[in-house]
Each structure stands twice: as C-alpha cells, then as structure tokens.
Amino acid sequence: MEKLTIGVLSLQGNFQSHINHFLQLQNPSLKVIEVRNKTNLRECDGIVIPGGESTTLRKCMSYDNDSLYNALKNYIHVKKKPVWGTCAGCILLSEKVEKNKDDNIENEYGNDFSLGGLDIEITRNYYGSQNDSFICSLDIKSQDPIFKKNIRAPCIRAPFIKKISSDKVVTIATFSHESFGKNIIGAVEQDNCMGTIFHPELMPYTCFHDYFLEKVKKHIKDSREA
C-alpha cells in the first residue's frame, strides 16, 4: 500500500493535537510527521499550519534568512500542494491581514507577513482576549458527507474573515454569535488551500482532518493524471 505523508508545522502552538487527530483516522497508508524546516517540508504531500500566535509563527519561519517561509510560499503557490491553516494558520494563509492598532507587522514584514493562498481579508484577535474565547455551533455549508451535523467548534482569540475577495473561495461552514451576528464565516477553501478560524483539533470529531486527508489524496491522484 502506497504511503502518503501529511506534515504538521511544529514550531509553536498545539501541533500535537493535530497529529493525534490524523492518527485517530487509523489509515494504514498515512504517515504524519512534524515539520520544523524545509527538509521536512519536502517529504510532505500536504501540510497543516496549526493555531498558536501568528506573529510568533512568522518569526519562527524567519530563521536562516526566511528559508522556511520561502519554502512554504513555493509549496503553496508553485507546487500547489494542499495546505490547511487553523486559527493563526488561517491568518498566515490569508492574502490580506488587517492591521490591528497594536500591530507592528507592517513595519517588520511589509507585504511579506502572510503566506497567502486564500483570497480573503482577515482581522487578528477580532473577538477579544483569551477570556473572550467561546464554543460555537457550526452551520456546515459543504455537501460533503464527511462533515457531520451539529458540530461545535472552539474559537480561541479567533480571527475574523472580514471579506472574501474571489469567487474561487468556497465557504465550508459558518456560525452565529450573540454579540457579532449571524452567518460569520468559520471555514473556507480555495483550490489547494483550506482555512478554519477555529480549532477542530481540540474536539473529539475528526471530520475536518478526514476532509483534508481526502483533499491530499485527490491532489496526488490529479497530479499523476496530469
């Protein structure tokens, strides 16, 4: 049985929970590895950028003259391999990150803070501090039977997808919040990229990890047939 490899960026954040969720799928063809450098990245058929703190993750990518940052950009935009970002990872996949009043990312990185891949505009820490974290009930828009109904998802210092800038972006799930309104975008995908503002790796279900695995399988199959 041919193996496929999914990597989880393991620089900062709760990467171990993502690894555990993929292992729960009990797929004998799946190998899951920690990714800490561009050598690890070369092994991967798909990669997850976990939650954590987006500016810290970006700084970790800056080591060795931005070598991992540049390798990830090439992975996303040139090789077009599947990438999934959760929370901070979703921020880093956004084409435009709205500047917060306390941010210094524009001065430090210019236009090179995010990796891009999702044509969305996103605001960091939109819902407040750690104390303002909440669990939402997702309204699944995807017709894929992998997704269960009545899914709840934790939003921890979550970003807000302010704008979708391309009709190539597909909404996977939305949710409502008593203070912020209805139909808030929670999960999106565009071509090889997928983003969730919440943390499915902290919940018992594995449907988002299963969905990403299927995305990786499809990419491998399509690449061979091209």
UniProtKB/Swiss-Prot annotation:
One of its GO terms (biological process) is pyridoxine metabolic process. Its EC number is 4.3.3.6, 3.5.1.2. The keyword Protein biosynthesis does not apply. Signal peptide: none annotated. It catalyses: aldehydo-D-ribose 5-phosphate + D-glyceraldehyde 3-phosphate + L-glutamine = pyridoxal 5'-phosphate + L-glutamate + phosphate + 3 H2O + H(+); L-glutamine + H2O = L-glutamate + NH4(+). L-glutamine binds at residues 52-54, 124, 156-157. Pfam families: SNO (PF01174). The active site is at residues 87, 199, 201. Disulfide bonds: none annotated. It comes from the Eukaryota. Pathway: Cofactor biosynthesis; pyridoxal 5'-phosphate biosynthesis. Gene3D superfamilies: 3.40.50.880. InterPro entries: Class_I_gatase-like, PdxT/SNO, PdxT/SNO_CS. One of its GO terms (cellular component) is glutaminase complex. One of its GO terms (molecular function) is glutaminase activity. Catalyzes the hydrolysis of glutamine to glutamate and ammonia as part of the biosynthesis of pyridoxal 5'-phosphate. The resulting ammonia molecule is channeled to the active site of PdxS. In the presence of PdxS, forms a dodecamer of heterodimers. Only shows activity in the heterodimer. This is Pyridoxal 5'-phosphate synthase subunit Pdx2.
